[in-house]
Amino acid sequence: MISSKTSFIALIGNPVSHSFSPIMQNAAFQYLGLDLIYFAIPCKDEDLELVLNSLKKINCKGLNITIPHKEKVFNLCSEISPIARKLKAINTLKLNSENEWSATNTDLEGFIYPLKNLNLAKKKSIVLGSGGAAKSVIQGLINLNLSKISVIGRNKSSLDELIKNFGNQIELHSFLSNDNQTQNLIEEADLIINTTPVGMKTAKNEMNLLPYGDYFWRSLNSKTIVYDLIYNPAPTHLLKFSANKGCMTIDGLQMLVAQGLKSLSFWTNGLEVPFHIMNDALKNHL
């Protein structure tokens, strides 16, 4: 029950109305018996500094940061973890002993969670998209020791940014729907990860589309694991299509829950919740 002593943790971004984080985090707080609530706060770019400075002065114990603020929040933090610096993105904050924001990124651990036991070392992978989410995915694949990481994207500037970050650890390919080289990559891939928004429920007219179009996927075969970071709808059109091809599929819910567990541990100095507590709360909501 909320009382005058209840503290809070919030999600800051724009938009935030689609987020499932309040559902799973409040389930975790209830499981742990914490006098905490979690809710989402929409915040425009120009208000970010004001909002974060204001939250220091009230009973806020931590934050999640989502798009479009994951990079812009750097200048408002006094302590930043090595992984957040490496990825140039922050998704979790807490107030330190000096009442300043300490920051980390839990997306990497969230992404890896459903892949840990799949023995992907020395396997070949494709990352679709070159935006912010691709950075966590690529670093995760490097950590899992995959032998080949091919990135297929449309945006030259963001592809160039990935090369600055990861150098010769990745191969870049501009999107061409009739590109035979791309089809060879798809045919040999052991793992394909979609980091684009195509297929997301909130993406206008894109929910029933495949990333890069149907023709792009003509060489997909059943040995490939297909991982879609999108979690709403579940399953996405891509995962339904891939399952019909006989592929193992992974949806974004597992990543969402796993990164949420790591954020919770960061806020509470090490408290842990069983995976199923958050996962069941989300599935009941869906």
Curated annotation (Swiss-Prot):
Catalytic activity reported: shikimate + NADP(+) = 3-dehydroshikimate + NADPH + H(+)
Biological process annotations from GO: amino acid biosynthetic process; aromatic amino acid family biosynthetic process; chorismate biosynthetic process; shikimate metabolic process
Residue numbers binding shikimate: S19, F20, S21, T66, N91, D107, Y231
InterPro entries (UniProt xref): Aminoacid_DH-like_N_sf, NAD(P)-bd_dom_sf, SDH_C, Shikimate_DH, Shikimate_DH-bd_N, Shikimate_DH_fam, Shikm_DH/Glu-tRNA_Rdtase
GO cellular component: cytosol
Highest rank taxon of the organism: Bacteria
Any one GO molecular-function label of the UniProt entry: NADP binding
Transmembrane segments: none
Chain residues that bind NADP(+): G129, S130, G131, G132, A133, L229, G252
SUPFAM superfamilies, sorted: Aminoacid dehydrogenase-like, N-terminal domain (SSF53223), NAD(P)-binding Rossmann-fold domains (SSF51735)
Pathway involvement of the protein, from the record: Metabolic intermediate biosynthesis; chorismate biosynthesis; chorismate from D-erythrose 4-phosphate and phosphoenolpyruvate: step 4/7
EC number: 1.1.1.25
Active site positions, chain numbering: K70
Keyword field: Amino-acid biosynthesis, Aromatic amino acid biosynthesis, NADP, Oxidoreductase
Quaternary structure and interacting proteins, as annotated: Homodimer.
Family statement: Belongs to the shikimate dehydrogenase family.
Function: Involved in the biosynthesis of the chorismate, which leads to the biosynthesis of aromatic amino acids. Catalyzes the reversible NADPH linked reduction of 3-dehydroshikimate (DHSA) to yield shikimate (SA).
Descriptive protein name: Shikimate dehydrogenase (NADP(+))
Organism: Prochlorococcus marinus (strain MIT 9301)
Gene name of the record: aroE
